[in-house]
Amino acid sequence: MSKLVPIEVTEDRRPTDIKQIQFRLASPEKVMSWSHGEVKKPETINYRTLKPERDGLFCAKIFGPVRDYECLCGKYKKMRYKGVVCEKCGVEVTSTKVRRIRMGHIELVTPVAHIWYVSSLPSRIGTLLGIKMKDLERVLYYEAYIVESGGEAYYDAEAKTPVLKYDVLNEEQYRTLVSRFGELGFKARMGGEVVRDLLDSIDLVDLFTQLKEDIELTKSEAKTKTIAKRLKVIESFLNSGNNPAWMMLTVLPVLPPDLRPLVSLDGGKFAVSDVNDLYRRVINRNQRLKRLVELEAPEIIVRNEKRMLQESVDALFDNGRRANAVKGANKRPLKSLSEIIKGKQGRFRQNLLGKRVDFSGRTVIVVGPSLSMDECGLPKKMALELFKPHLIAKLEDKGYATTVKAAKKMIEDKTNEVWECLAEIVDGYPVLLNRAPTLHKLSIQAFHPKLIDGKAIQLHPLVCAAFNADFDGDQMAVHIPLSSAAIAEAKVLMLASMNILLPASGKAIATPSQDMVLGIYYITLEKNGVKGSNKLFANVDEVRIAIEHDALDIHAKVRTRDDGRIIHTTAGRMLLKAILPNFVPSELWNRVMKKKAINEVVDYVQKHGGIGVTAGFLDRLKNLGFKHATEAGISISIDDIKIPAGKEAKIAESKNRVFEIQKQFEAGLLTEQERYNKIIDVWTDTNNTLATQMMDLVQTDKAGFNSIHMMADSGARGSAAQIRQLAGMRGLMAKPSGEIIETPIISNFKEGLNVVEYFISTHGARKGLADTALKTANAGYLTRKLVDVAQNVKIVEHDCHTHEGIEISDISDQNTLIESLEDRLNGRVLADDVIDPISNEILFAEGTLLDEVSAKVIAEAGIKTAYIRTPTTCKSENGICALCYGVNLATGQIVRRGEAVGIIAAQSIGEPGTQLTLRTFHVGGTASSTAQERQVVAEKEGFIRYYNLKTYVSKEGRNIVANRRNAAVLLVEPKIKAPFSGRVEIQTVHDEVIISVSSKTDTIRYVLRKNEIAKPNELAGVGGQIEGKYYFPYESGAEVQEYESIVETIKDGWNVPSRIPYASEVLVANGAPVTQKIFAKEDGVVKYFLLRGDYLERFEGLKAGYEVIEKGLFATVVDSNNREAVRHYIARGSIIVAEDDAVVDPKTLIAKPKNDESTVIAEWDPYSNPIISETSGTVKFEDIIIGTTATEQYDELTGKTRLMISDHVPAEYKPTIVLASEDGELLRYQVQSKTSIYVEDGAKVKVADIIAKTPKALQKSSDITGGLPRVSELFEGRRPKATALISEIDGVVSFGKSLRGKIRIIVASDNGILKEYFVDKSHTPVVNSGDFVHAGERLTSGIISSHELLRIMGVKTLYNYLVSEVQQVYRSQGVNISDKHIEVIFTQMLRQVKILKSGDTKFIEGDLISKVKFAQENEKIIKLGGRPAIAEPFLVGITRAAVSADSIISAASFQDTTKVLTEAAVSAKVDDLNDLKENVIIGRTIPVGTGIYKDQEIMFGYN
């Protein structure tokens, strides 16, 4: 951008538009040039005449006339004297508006420091002079001396330590030095003058070069830091052309009087702005000081007065920053200039970002069920007031009134003409409705008003969800758009019918709820054997007539024609079909319409019919719902609540089970933890059983027409969980600490709770209310931070032409799917071709925009990962390109240029914040430690491959897992087989991997894409997804037999230790087939093939009942065009059910296993972690001493005693079991507290014997930060307290010598790199000696820090981690948010880089610089032939990112206002006004939407 020239602003010439705003320090000359005169007296106005005093704070001579065009003494009045200066009172005759512009000044007798540059860290004056802030304050407040020149002075008699310039001395030192060296050039002074002189005398360039040398030479970390700090400040002065001496004030500007008004109240009192009081103190002290100096008063008195002057100026700028705040008459601190601009009540947030506007009103809302989608009811009274100017114009226009006065009179009388004109104005004129809190863009929508009587606004029921409004007393505000542009915008973009989709997820939000759902659900239910069953109806009119004549029940099953075939439906569903558009298929409406089903229909209509169709359809749906909900007359009765008959018995049985567990515990068979876990299990199980019995009862009651069941089942109100509390048992409750109380509430609400039960349940209820209050505030703050950090993200171009993308896959958390790949692909652009794994054809090329259909195609093709373009990898400057962002979810189209995607992202993440829990709710105790945590079961077909898996064979002949990590059991199917025996060679060329098989006579090569092959860290469970990727069972150079598979597709995998714990028993052998029931899944004909090489060879003549012995048998289903529709792998040992060439439909069984048992891959003890012997040998105990570190436990079953490590082991003991193997090697096993030991001292053990067992930790209801705190933790990039250490390289672990009680972990890579890590006491290592770890894998317990992840694994890994973590929180609460919103925020967190080497640039090492500035500076330096700077990506939390925004105005209005402005003034920063916030503040058009074309000429062509 070319250098812009500052605009000279004068009183009569104000700029219409500005390009930039610069902040600078004001020189004394500048202050004088602003000033219109010196304020000499502290007086304000004369109490008798109420006229301003001359030379006082409100002086008319300095600041301008009090009355428009009238001088103070009244000699000159009226416009004709404009510009005349009255010779009597000295006032210029002009508009009184100048009192808002004209400034005055105060000549200070002595220079005074500006408190911002002293006390706001880092203290600028202190840093420049190189003295501590405390010392600087002592000098300024006349408590200490600062050395101006040391001369030949020394502190000690031996002349060893010289007195240096800038040393700070106390009174005593000063006296001594003056008496000894006063003649020899020693000079020291105190106060503002000396500081100003010192600042004036600094040669910045000299100092800069000298410090640059120092920083190169110094070795110490701390010194480097302090020098870098100084360099930064010096550099900012050098670049800005500011003079450091200007930080000391010699002339104080005085604010224009109308900005610090003095208002007279009734009763002769005055309301006065605090700033006036602060100015008066400054003037008083300054005048007194002047007199004292003239009188040549004693030094001590003058000094005191100077100190008081400094203090009063400090108070004026920032009261209370230093020492005690100056208090006013009413004992509260006075509001200084800093306080006026900062904080929620400050200028920025109160008056600039949120203004109150004209033409607005607010009132209560009531429901308007008769309105159509775009309408709202507006009370006539309000309309009359809001449209008053329009009305006056209209009345004059029509000739009903001749003058404004007459028109006003008519409006007051409310004559008929007025109503007629009002109706004409309002017709087609949109109004905006807004409901606070405005959490997202749907909280402000436009409607066409309908004039109504009464005093309440009527709101359409369907828009309530978007506004989050209900009718229990909510209020809404109305705003009138005035300009034609605003009206157009309201009509085109903001009408309610345009806002059917939620920008956060693209799902419809204006969908029926509550009564409407109930009505629609009710009419789509079916009943057997009612009037008119099985009749045939031609159309809906016949149905209506029949119902009206009572010949047909609305729930009767009837038949009708649809698409030329007869379908079975019900009378009610035909009524529903009548209001649907024609293109809706019957499977969408011919079913029981629950809330979800209705939403699906609305989504379908929106996608295929567009906005116009949808709006009309929604209105018809609303009317139908309300009508039938009314007619159904569904009500609640206590008898609808059905309590299961077997409840008493079931509870009695559970009590007995608990009693048994208690007895076992008392006998010492169970630990306290096991007892607790088991009891909780019993009750959870009881509660679930009762709940299912009760739900069955309610469902079957009245043949499905039980009112309570209908309400919950339809999704209108209530849930199964609530019915369970009404009719089952209330269940387990949690203590304040989050532990679950083991005595449950047995009663339900119908029976009533007893006193104890009631008391237990009150805690949860009260906590719920407290949480809600806290939550709202937290969620609001999170939204504000998000908006602030993302406000400048907009779409700047269509395509940035990057080829980079990020690999994505399903997000799941320990087998529960959180977000599917299909969902994640919808509305995104591919960054790489997607290849069909079956046919190897390109399904979708790079650059394709995927919609729901294509995303589904990809998912159904069995593809598990894909590369997509994301905002994070976008190369656009100052924004994002449309293709990296994808679809705008609110419209379903590719996003348009100028869309403010940052704000939309922030709102989408912030708005559901209130729904997130503050702490995770505690659903079950250990209800989950059931079968799933004892074993893993194969759910797909294929065969088993061990990856790195080693096993021990125990004495019972079991296979026990010997790996602690970096191993897995894979379930695969063959992809390529070796066509002949030979040697396998694998080589990587660019992004392709070539696998070849060579025999003596022949070589064959297969080419695969590199990113389709599972990487070692992915196989070990450290990286991304392995499902759907390829695995090479043979290493390069291995020999293979003919028809052995050399490339396999991974269908599932269980890695050690996260899916299969150490020391589990593996129940499947390497290479064993896993059979499943295989269904056709498509219509067509079955054909069987065998895999040969990488192609399929026809295998004919298979009959039903055949047991498969072939390897690599595939069944394909081909469609009528002989195209392969689907391919299934048939594992050995399956029984063929569908013979070759059989015709099948999707549900046909093709093959099945021999027996129906599922294949268990591995199983383990769910209640404890075993320690097993790794070799045979002899056991020896260390530090296991009965009574000190261990206790004896008697086992009733075996009759033996067993040692158990005590709960609290004294610090000096480390209980260890040492195993001496037969060849003399020693293996040490440290045992934790509560471990039971299964061997005796000196016993002999065999491989894989259990030595000891540690019980798994007590299952507290999850205490991991969940909900809101977790989200803000992720976005703030906080370093968690308990950070896990992560390995930076791939390598083998060993343990070195401990250092100061810290364990030393060494990771050594193949190429000889060693990395050392020290584990402190609070963490425990999770790796063992000899383990192989991958980069990014954790070495100790704790949470992985995002910063570490970024440093070691890079941006893409961090991206996947953050997106999945945030999604986990939101999805678990049932909130759908598209990934792209999280990505936009994440991109903003990465917009800065950290300088590692500064090269020849102006950066300083360790600086955080925005990527844009970094690139610009480097480009400039390279052009000049210098060395560019080197930087690394750096993750900044959203608060820091917002405060360090490139725009000063935006940063200042967010937080730390004084700090930001201080920094900006010193470095003379320029705000380019590129983003939303600063433009809102100064009142320009914002540069998004049509605002991006603001400066462009538009050409119209005629043809």
Curated annotation (Swiss-Prot):
Q: Which GO terms describe its biological process?
A: DNA-templated transcription
Where does the source fall among the domains of life?
A: Bacteria
**Got a GO cellular component term for this one?**
DNA-directed RNA polymerase complex
Q: Tell me which residues bind Mg(2+).
A: D470, D472, D474
Quaternary structure annotation from Swiss-Prot or TrEMBL? The RNAP catalytic core consists of 2 alpha, 1 beta, 1 beta' and 1 omega subunit. When a sigma factor is associated with the core the holoenzyme is formed, which can initiate transcription.
Query: What HAMAP family does the record point to?
Result: RNApol_bact_RpoC (MF_01322)
Q: What does this protein do?
A: DNA-dependent RNA polymerase catalyzes the transcription of DNA into RNA using the four ribonucleoside triphosphates as substrates.
Designated name of the protein: DNA-directed RNA polymerase subunit beta'
- Which taxonomic lineage does the organism of this UniProt entry have? Bacteria, Pseudomonadati, Campylobacterota, Epsilonproteobacteria, Campylobacterales
